[in-house]
Amino acid sequence: MSKYSDAKELAGLTLGQKTEYSNQYDASLLQPVPRSLNRNDLALNGELPFVGHDIWTMYELSWLNTNGLPQVAVGEVFIPATSQNLIESKSFKLYLNSYNQTQFENWDQVTERLTQDLSACAGESVIVNVNSVTDYTNQPIVTMEGDCIDNQDIQITSYDFEASLLEGAAGEQEVEETLHSHLLKSNCLITNQPDWGSVEIAYSGKQIDREALLRYLVSFREHNEFHEQCVERIFTDIMKYCAPSKLTVFARYTRRGGLDINPYRSTEQDRPSHNKRMARQ
């Protein structure tokens, strides 16, 4: 359990509560969660050691045009890691549902409204793209870059989070490599529901022992934090124990409630080169 799971900032969230579903536009449904909650726990109190974005994909986005004809789209939202807040996912879903029976003049108006409301909730300007289903149909399903570290013949008996599993994981050889795992699983901070993801780790520096890295990632299996918080924890732990000169951590989680969340943190560029979905998304 995370140290801040009982924080007062989480007490009023709709997550884990019985809620009414509104089909009329209502921006007040959005609920922020201060990023400072987990960053204080990670001693990230000053300048951040990374840049990045939380990339959300909205698969259940629909509204009415001025003739009352339903419109459907697939949307993308890029929320800067520097924003004051992350957006709580159930409130995001309820907010999107409030578009369902609301008329908008055109697609641009929908994009503008989403941008305005999500920026206000995050506390910083976000980027929103609204795509037609036809355009999105041509997007390929991709796999992660680099070597998969999952097929190791190792025995694991503990699933309690333990950052120190990375202690001594940095070897002597200098490398630049990309590794990935599909075994990332954590639990929702509030509801304890499982969150399933894949994570790509690109770095330059002392070569990281793959067994130690896999054991570390598997230790998230019973850990309770939001997606974004887990990725920042992975980033800071690798920096602490392995000290690479360059590091990028990019996780892609399976969708829930018509939304998937793909946090990206890096010492290099502030967003990935693409937002293409994986087989489990």
Swiss-Prot record:
Pathway(s) this gene product operates in, as recorded in its UniProt entry: tRNA modification; tRNA-queuosine biosynthesis
Task: Name the UniProt key words of this record, in alphabetical order.
Answer: Cytoplasm, NADP, Oxidoreductase, Queuosine biosynthesis
Q: What is its EC number?
A: 1.7.1.13
Q: Can you say what this protein is called?
A: NADPH-dependent 7-cyano-7-deazaguanine reductase
Active site feature: 188, 195
Its encoding gene is what?
queF
Similarity-based family: Belongs to the GTP cyclohydrolase I family. QueF type 2 subfamily.
Species this protein is from: Vibrio atlanticus (strain LGP32) (Vibrio splendidus (strain Mel32))
Domain of life of the organism in this record? Answer: Bacteria
Going by the record, the broad EC class of this enzyme is oxidoreductase
Write the lineage as a comma-separated list.
Bacteria, Pseudomonadati, Pseudomonadota, Gammaproteobacteria, Vibrionales
